Curated annotation (Swiss-Prot):
The species this protein was found in: Xenopus laevis (African clawed frog)
Keywords assigned: Activator, Developmental protein, Differentiation, DNA-binding, Homeobox, Neurogenesis, Nucleus, Transcription, Transcription regulation
Gene (UniProt): meis3-b
BP GO terms, sorted: angiogenesis; animal organ morphogenesis; anterior/posterior pattern specification; brain development; central nervous system development; embryonic pattern specification; eye development; hemopoiesis
Protein name as it appears in the record: Homeobox protein meis3-B
Species classification: Eukaryota, Metazoa, Chordata, Craniata, Vertebrata
Keyword Chloroplast tagged: no
Main location: nucleus
Amino acid sequence: MAQRYDEMVHYPGLDGMSLAGFADAHTGRALQHHSLSQSTPYGSTGAAHRVPMPPGMGSNDGLKREKDEIYGHPLFPLLALVFEKCELATCSPRDNSGSFPGGDVCSSDSFNEDIAVFAKQVRTEKPLFSSNPELDNLMIQAIQVLRFHLLELEKVHDLCDNFCHRYITCLKGKMPIDLVIDDRDGSSKSDLEDFTGSCTSLSDQNNTWIRDHDETGSTHSGTPGPSSGGLASQSGDNSSEQGDCMDNSVASPSTGDDDDLDRDKKRNKKRGIFPKVATNIMRAWLFQHLSHPYPSEEQKKQLAQDTGLTILQVNNWFINARRRIVQPMIDQSNRTGQGGAPYSPDGQNMGGYVMDGQQHMGIRPPGFQGIPGDYTAAPSTMPMGFPPAGYTPAIPPHSAGLRHGPSLHSYLPGHPHSMILPAGASPHHLVSAQSPADALLNGQNIDIHAH
């Protein structure tokens, strides 16, 4: 700093006053020339060298003389210094090396120290002002403007630093996974293993419950019926749910905080992993209405109230259940049938059931090829494929104690419990006040676990 001022050669001197008193000391002086404020809209800040030159004088000579006056003014080194600081303040990145007194070279504090150093350098020199008061005014006001500009730049830097600090703090608070990797590597691994083990144990318990339930159903029926296929599909659904739980645990490692566990639970709920109680209620309704597994709007509202789910979630669950549970049961009945036509997605006879697109599912007669008598199937008169109203199948001996009407197995051809009519049965034994179609449509449920 001292060397820079020593290199300047045109110092006329300084009497020890500070820069703040420069303007006050100069205002008492009488102006010897007319003011330039009348010729420029910017007042006295206009440059003295921009005064129009008389026609008789050369413009180049006058311009050179004015430049020499500005460059030789005692305050010009200070003006150049503050201008350089403003340039440094707009540079990126800022220089925080602290090479100048005051640390940061572009700070306002460093400029105050530069003024003190400048006053010491020119204290023994000539007076601070020149013989041109307009030029003195120009230099003082230019230094003041640059000083204000430097202060504004310092405020901008402070705001930027504050914003960066708050932004980084916010990122660290919103993204704790990076901190987990650095600081909680061991604890996160142990928490992840515990959470994965709990999901595996839940899956084992669920599979054990399914096997026990399957053995109980086989004991009651004596033969593996469609219920085994339904339970197998349930096992697949539960396993897939447990798999989603394990995948979710791997995707989001635990941080050991309650907030993360709550976030995982909410994510599981959004992914469609419903509580076991809710799925059991909906499965029970599905097996009770296998002849038409399409709940009405009122039934959906009731199921949603019983399960604590929304109507949309109940609707989506039944759409998936008809594809994963009911359809495998239909396929199994087709494989075990004796003469039933294969399943066709176009709606042909398939032995027991048919899925008419995604609209409804009814029971269509497979033809009743093995039934003697005067009955002839007339599918054109029954849109849902039920036998005519005058036809009633023979009731098996053990079905008298059933609470839900005839078993579904009696309508499956080739099933061990399918109905067998005597060859000499009289027509009046086949007449009933209510047909199976009326019984089903009037709300009687079918229980496939009754055997």
